[in-house]
Amino acid sequence: MLQITIRSGVAMHRFLPALLLGAALLFPPAALAADKVLIVLSGEGRDAGKTRPGYEFDELSQAWLVFKANGLAVEVASPQGGPVEPDKYNPDEPFNAQLLADGAAMAQLAATRPIAGLRASDYRAVYVVGGKGAMFDLPRSQPLQQLIGAAWANGAVIAAVCHGPAALAEVRLADGSPLVAGRQLTGFTNEEEALFGKKWAKEFPWLLEDALRQRGGEWSEAPLMMPHVVIDGRLVTGQNPYSTVGVAEAIVRGLGRTPVARTPGRDERSMALVERLRGGDAAGAARTLKQDPASYHVELIGMLGFYQAKAADVDLAALRPALQTMELAMPYMAEPQLKLGIAEAHLRLGDRSRARTLVLEVLDASPGMQQAGDLLKRIDS
């Protein structure tokens, strides 16, 4: 399940979502009818992220739907205002399709409010959406820094997901200290950046994890691309896109509300299944997936395990759950790269026989596949 870390004083406790009903006690109550959330988007994007990176539409749509379902008013802003462009995304994902069908929401996205024209006192919460564009225009926007600082001083919940915490890096409190100093938080990790941020990372002003650590933030992270939300008082941060719903519901709780019941999406169910596997119940996770594979995003599970195995390198303790995750997806995926990834993991763990069997299966289906042939040579060397 989604991992959520709540900080209260100096003690740290980990809770499952079902135990978070008391989290609202960490925040000041607000008048329900007046609760308004400001969503901040990067305006950097061009050409669906091809020539300049933008924001992540998935991180916008999933949070927006949570906010609206819980009766919160929503406004959207960007550093310069006007239309903003997301990176490439799947419009057929149910949460994206639902937002795209909302005419009022799309009108806001076509004419986002410029940050400089906003009053912090109008908002009970600020939510910063990620995407690699957030690493460029958000941390250099002084009006945004001032708005977040003033909103924090007014008692607002400040939240960000994935690369969104870049907007927090340069925020200063009234005494000149960084907002993040001494506070538990998370965001897109250096490990995740090394695998998924290569195109733009060389242009970043800094790596997000490094910047927040250097400014005194107490960094927290889960394994690669696993959902992870950190709550420290009124500061709520999420590690990656799969933390979006957890962040949004933490904001709802922070405003004194109990999130309405909802059916988890396919990606959420898939991540929860992987968490179950990583918690020691690989057999139970496999049985659950076998009962209804269509309710899960099997390709996501396979890809997650593949990249976790790649990131594990020589860390065999990290490699084993990555291998189990790939094997969870393998019966439902015909992708030869996944089977080769599993073979590679077995080889690294010392099981040459199993690795060889898997590679031969790939070569039987694709006799000329050079990558499989090269791996077989390594196994037999």
Residues of each region from the PLM?
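N-terminal signal peptide c-region/cleavage motif recognized by signal peptidases
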Residues: 28-29
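Extended, subdomain-level signal for the structured scaffold at the beginning of enzyme domains
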Residues: 34-153, 167-186, 191-203, 207-209, ...
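Hydrophobic helical h-region of N-terminal Sec-dependent signal peptides
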Residues: 17-21, 25
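Alpha-helical and His/Cys-centered functional microenvironments
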Residues: 6-7, 17, 350
